[in-house]
Design a protein with these regions (language model features):
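Short, Lys/Arg-enriched N-terminal segments with co-localized hydrophobic residues
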Residues: 34-53
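N-terminal interaction modules that seed assembly of large macromolecular complexes
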Residues: 54, 62, 67-116
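A structured, charge-rich N-terminal accessory region that forms the first stable segment of a protein
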Residues: 59, 132-153, 164-174
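Long, compositionally biased
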Residues: 101-137, 141
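Glycine-rich, aromatic-bearing surface loops/beta-hairpins
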Residues: 166-200
Length: 200
């Protein structure tokens, strides 16, 4: 994997996969995608429309809340849309304000409190146990959601952006960890979201 990683920073994702996909097993490509989406700089270069006027703290707060939504969904085995429906816009604005403090706590502790407070029941959408490959981390998927929120949110309205993305069909597509959706080009996901369907 080292020789792949060395070239990662010098190639855009499409060119990278074009060069190596014919010579790499799927598990390696998935790993490369996880490395790729952990680099905020690389992803931001891909994603047209990313809001560059926000402070790093504001972006970090969005990232934290996106990770938290993903964690709660996995823990309760729910669709991401079903989780976000429990939160009003004011609720999410509060979570964004608390993000700087809550990130010092474990996701487990914070999620337990929210699951109890908002009465989030267990579902049957178990994307982790159904995954036949290495499960992408909560933080990797959270970063992907963060970039989508930054790309589509109206007038720096982060709470509304989170609601819009997590209420969308795109979350079920990303949550299918047996597919290649979660490690495809982030701008492709943005365009698919705006189109209301996965583009061919």
């Amino acid at each position: 994997m080292i020789r792949y990683g060395i070239l990662l920073m010098g190639l855009c994702q499409e060119r990278f996969l074009e060069v190596f996909s014919g010579n790499m097993p799927n598990s390696d490509i998935r790993h490369i995608r996880l490395v790729f989406i952990r680099s905020t700089h690389c992803v931001a270069l891909h994603l047209k429309g990313v809001n560059l006027s926000m402070t790093e703290k504001q972006k970090d707060d969005i990232y934290y809340v996106c990770c938290l939504m993903e964690f709660i969904a996995r823990k309760t085995k729910n669709h991401r849309q079903d989780v976000v429906r429990h939160f009003t816009k004011k609720d999410l604005e509060r979570q964004l304000r608390l993000a700087e403090v809550n990130h010092c706590l474990s996701f487990e502790q914070v999620s337990d409190e929210l699951i109890e407070d908002y009465k989030i029941q267990d579902g049957m959408f178990d994307t982790v146990n159904e995954c036949r490959y290495e499960v992408p981390s909560v933080t990797s998927i959270g970063m992907l959601y963060q970039e989508l929120v930054l790309a589509i949110m109206p007038e720096e309205d982060a709470a509304q952006g989170i609601i819009d993305i997590f209420s969308s069909f795109i979350t079920d597509e990303i949550s299918d960890f047996n597919s290649n959706v979660y490690y495809t080009n982030p701008d492709y996901l943005r365009c698919s979201y705006l189109e209301g369907k996965m583009l061919a």
